[in-house]
Amino acid sequence: MTNKITERITGHTELIGLIATPIRHSLSPTMHNEAFAKLGLDYVYLAFEVGDKELKDVVQGFRAMNLRGWNVSMPNKTNIHKYLDKLSPAAELVGAVNTVVNDDGVLTGHITDGTGYMRALKEAGHDIIGKKMTICGAGGAATAICIQAALDGVKEISIFNRKDDFYANAEKTVEKINTKTNCKAQLFDMEDHEQLRKEIAESVIFTNATGVGMKPFEGETLLPSADMLRPELIVSDVVYKPTKTRLLEIAEEQGCQTLNGLGMMLWQGAKAFEIWTHKEMPVDYIKEILF
């Protein structure tokens, strides 16, 4: 890190955390601690292995210890709202939280995944406004992406998910998009491969917003056939470790433009950083370190 952490931690240092499982792969501690050090801010960011069973107790503990805030990742994004005091309008609409801020004992949940995804596309030179996208996934990140894309002006969104516990959540997402935005959303079963082929063929971007591709699912992909992809298609993955998932490898082989999850991670983190500190993250500096 820029400064030895022991040289800058004092009795006044405020703690910010990350709760998820698995957690050891995360680049968020590096990103935020480097940003704190660069700006001379008296915070430290630590990762905590937390799943469903521990979530309630951990939030109560964080509240009691007066943490400034924390990030939330899988599998906690759609459950943590029960233990918070308030939700931002975006988090309420999405039904998920990835950032919590503690303002004088009041815990407010925010969602920055969707804005991070759209900003990453913009920074990479991709414009999907007024166009159609196909996305796999129905968890917190996928929902945030779909809602933000719809709000930003994407014309159509086709969502694919297995008929698991998240399918009902995807049905709610489709209803929200169709009733509260000008975007048309549809939901399909992930096992309907012919429908997936059709929707990808009509889309400018295909996105994996599931954990498939990261540990313990490295080397796997939800894409049933490589010939569903075409050279002019943008293929993105929210997974950033590994930086090139099996999906992105296949996409490159098919001549597609590809985008991994690093950009989304950076820009959602920059927004969370601003929520906690009221300062702008030194994004160019962080890019040099992470990319």
Curated annotation (Swiss-Prot):
Family matches, as Pfam families: SDH_C, Shikimate_dh_N
GO biological process: amino acid biosynthetic process; aromatic amino acid family biosynthetic process; chorismate biosynthetic process; shikimate metabolic process
Binding annotation for shikimate: S26, L27, S28, S73, N98, D113, Y240
Domain of life: Bacteria
CDD domains: NAD_bind_Shikimate_DH (cd01065)
Top-level EC class as recorded in UniProt: oxidoreductase
Keywords for this protein: Amino-acid biosynthesis, Aromatic amino acid biosynthesis, NADP, Oxidoreductase
Residues that bind NADP(+): G137, A138, G139, G140, A141, V238, G261
Stored HAMAP family: Shikimate_DH_AroE (MF_00222)
Family: Belongs to the shikimate dehydrogenase family.
Record's function text: Involved in the biosynthesis of the chorismate, which leads to the biosynthesis of aromatic amino acids. Catalyzes the reversible NADPH linked reduction of 3-dehydroshikimate (DHSA) to yield shikimate (SA).
Subunit text: Homodimer.
The name this protein goes by in its record: Shikimate dehydrogenase (NADP(+))
Species in which this protein is naturally found: Listeria innocua serovar 6a (strain ATCC BAA-680 / CLIP 11262)
Lineage: Bacteria, Bacillati, Bacillota, Bacilli, Bacillales
Gene name linked to the record: aroE
